Amino acid sequence: MIDYDPTRPKWVQIYEVVRARIESGEYPPNHLISEVQMESEFHVARVTIRKVTAQLREDGLIITTPGMGSFVASKKAPGND
């Protein structure tokens, strides 16, 4: 669990933690991003976690496959946009 800053939305703070884990390699490509696990770890409601995953998806950090779940996206090679 993290110490939340009451002046900022919780979902933004959780997003920053998860993004940092992805960027550091703690969550490698194809790692399952479990909403249930994040709910438990961060002690927040599912709707909050869904905001986090929506932003991660929009930023291209995760890919969601219906019926399978959300997974860390493979990193792009430098210069390949």
What would you call each of these model-derived segments?
Residues 1-44, 50-54, 58-63, 68, ...:
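Extreme N-terminal segment that seeds HTH/winged-HTH DNA-binding domains in transcriptional regulators
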